[in-house]
């Protein structure tokens, strides 16, 4: 892309994968003066007991996979002259569907789980569904609302 040709760059559920100075410099280069960088993540609402139990089951499996909740992605914004945080908005939302749809299949799509052998994924699916049943009494085919907190960051390009 040509330099200073873009009004805004938006990254949803992804910036933690490429949170480095090289990426920030390239985004800064293509943004017009006073351009905007938006970063958005949906995070499981671990204030809810059954969601927290699922998160605790997932945590040991993460390894060194880049994750939003580790906060490591934020380090690239420390002491850099390219972007200024203008705002952070947080809001609650839910995804509703069957336990299998919005819990099991969603968790199985997580990068480090999707890379596992199918047999291990199926075992985890069963464990996820057991956790939900233990806390909520809901079977895989029952409807449930999975709570999330959305974090929306707005950065503005600092003029050169």
Task: Report the location of each language-model feature.
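A short acidic, Gly/Pro-enriched loop at the edge of an enzyme's catalytic core
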Residues: 1-9
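Catalytic core of nucleotide-sugar-dependent glycosyltransferases
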Residues: 3, 26, 36, 41-42, ...
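Short glycine-/acidic-enriched loop or helix-start segments at secondary-structure transitions
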Residues: 2, 20-21, 48-50
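Conserved catalytic/acceptor-binding region of the Class I
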Residues: 28, 32-97
């Amino acid at each position: 892309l040509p330099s200073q040709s873009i009004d805004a760059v938006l990254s949803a559920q992804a910036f933690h994968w490429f949170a480095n100075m090289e990426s920030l410099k390239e985004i800064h280069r293509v943004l017009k003066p006073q351009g905007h960088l938006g970063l958005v993540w949906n995070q499981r609402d671990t204030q809810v007991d059954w969601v927290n139990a699922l998160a605790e089951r997932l945590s040991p499996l993460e390894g060194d996979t880049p994750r939003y909740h580790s906060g490591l992605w934020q380090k690239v914004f420390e002491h850099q002259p390219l972007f200024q945080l203008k705002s952070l908005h947080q809001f609650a939302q839910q995804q509703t569907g069957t336990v299998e749809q919005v819990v099991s299949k969603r968790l199985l799509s997580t990068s480090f789980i999707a890379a596992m052998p199918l047999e291990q994924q199926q075992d985890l699916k069963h464990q996820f569904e057991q956790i939900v049943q233990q806390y909520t009494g809901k079977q895989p085919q029952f409807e449930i609302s999975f709570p999330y907190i959305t974090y929306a960051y707005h950065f503005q390009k600092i003029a050169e």
